[in-house]
């Protein structure tokens, strides 16, 4: 039985890999980063258990569950790593692709980690002694990491990697402290890129998305005002493993913020600066974050600026209703026109039109969180050229029919799931991963039957 190739190690790619592996099929999971996990690994919490009993919940004080993302994701990452039918290729990407369904020849280029994965125990001693610091992508650049580092505490594989762009040995031919200090002699500065050839029956694309950079919208002050954050930066601040240990300290002065405003649709639902589509998950994650703030600090005030509330999932509207009625979250219908900073207090003055009241108003907040758009990954164009798949007008992977064939691309045997073909929330990404895995399994089984007959 030929294996299946899964490209992308986020929650969609992990779920697709596990679904296939549990059917007894071999899977090669390719991830460009040092660890699998994707964006979900960066999230503090996720509203996953939105039940249908929200009407009863208000009466019985049983509310929609807001779960820790790592408690959900980490077991799946470990299961994926330990599954005998799954081979994980981190820091890797597709370099060449040809063939047809049931007989795809793929070349995988694996970039050097400069650390022997078989020897490294993940002790972190090398990172402790490394003298070079750089902004941590995992911590949304709110904290630094070393030139040799483990991606994050729950990283899979739990192996260090060297950033060659800032490592003193690769930039100035000096240092090598990590090599001297490593008790397992795992550091290997001589590692070279490796090429792996695979023959697979099907391919599943789960390459995910990127977040819009709100610096393009200058009137919101992102990058100029320290207390204007993106939603991902906010997630890291309120996460227990984040740079502040889960305390919402303002970046300007370290004070705990108790008056927070969220701005929806930053970079989405616009024809000027950003993209015209809805990013699907912003309404719910802003509500989730607002509830978390009120739960942790009952004296706080939280406002959410929105154009329209799009609560399409099961129990989602009930969750928003509870946020309003029980947690006291204030929803303001209107898109802010400008955000200015008070030079003395560093508070933020939001100028907006309340479209329900029909008048221009202003609101003062200690922190403003911009809910940024989910946009196509920068590598989509390159990968589409290699595979021969189509992209839509925005740069997401296209499907042949979003209604009847929602996970099938124009190339037979190549399937998509998750946010690589448009913004999705976590439950929808997981559901699509199952659909893509089922399609890929059919290809593999059909090929096996044809060969035997």
Where do the protein language model's features map onto the residues?
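Residues forming the flavin
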Residues: 1-453
């Amino acid at each position: 039985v030929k294996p299946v190739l899964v490209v992308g190690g986020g929650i969609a790619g992990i779920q697709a890999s596990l679904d296939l592996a549990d059917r007894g099929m071999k899977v090669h999971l390719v991830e460009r980063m040092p660890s699998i996990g994707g964006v979900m690994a960066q999230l503090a919490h996720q509203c996953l258990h939105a039940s249908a009993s929200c009407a009863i919940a208000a009466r019985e004080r049983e509310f929609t569950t807001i779960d820790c993302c790592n408690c959900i994701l980490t077991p799946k990452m470990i299961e994926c790593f330990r599954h005998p039918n799954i081979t994980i290729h981190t820091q890797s990407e597709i370099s060449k692709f040809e063939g047809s369904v049931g007989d795809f020849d793929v070349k995988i280029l694996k970039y050097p980690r400069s650390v022997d994965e078989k020897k490294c125990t993940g002790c972190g001693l090398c990172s402790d002694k490394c003298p070079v610091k750089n902004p941590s992508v995992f911590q949304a650049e709110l904290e630094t990491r070393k030139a040799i580092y483990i991606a994050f505490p729950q990283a899979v594989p739990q192996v260090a990697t060297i950033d060659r762009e800032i490592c003193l040995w690769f930039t100035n031919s000096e240092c090598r402290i990590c090599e001297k200090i490593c008790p397992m002699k795992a550091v290997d500065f001589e590692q070279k890129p490796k090429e792996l050839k695979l023959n697979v029956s099907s391919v599943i694309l789960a390459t995910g998305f990127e977040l819009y950079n709100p610096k393009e919208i200058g009137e919101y002050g992102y990058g100029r005002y320290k207390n204007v954050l993106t939603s991902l930066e906010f997630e890291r601040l309120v996460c227990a493993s984040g740079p502040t240990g889960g305390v919402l300290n303002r970046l300007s002065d370290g004070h705990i913020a108790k008056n927070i405003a969220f701005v929806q649709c930053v970079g989405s639902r616009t024809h000027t600066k950003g993209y015209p589509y809805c990013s699907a998950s912003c309404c719910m994650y802003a509500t989730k974050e607002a509830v978390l703030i009120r739960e942790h600090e009952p004296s706080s005030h939280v406002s959410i600026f929105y154009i329209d509330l799009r609560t399409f999932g099961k129990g989602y509207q009930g969750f928003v209703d509870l946020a309003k009625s029980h947690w006291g979250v204030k929803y303001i219908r209107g898109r802010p026109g400008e955000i200015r900073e008070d030079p003395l207090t560093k508070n933020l003055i939001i100028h907006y039109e309340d479209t329900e009241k029909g008048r221009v108003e202003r609101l003062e907040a200690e922190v403003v969180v911009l809910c940024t758009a989910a946009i196509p990954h920068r590598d989509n164009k390159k990968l589409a050229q290699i595979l021969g798949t189509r992209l839509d007008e925005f740069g997401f992977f296209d499907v042949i029919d979003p209604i009847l064939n929602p996970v099938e691309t124009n190339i037979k045997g190549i399937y998509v799931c998750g946010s690589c073909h448009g913004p999705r929330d976590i439950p929808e990404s997981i559901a699509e991963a199952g659909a893509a895995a089922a399609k890929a399994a059919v290809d593999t089984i059909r090929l096996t039957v044809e060969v035997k007959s």
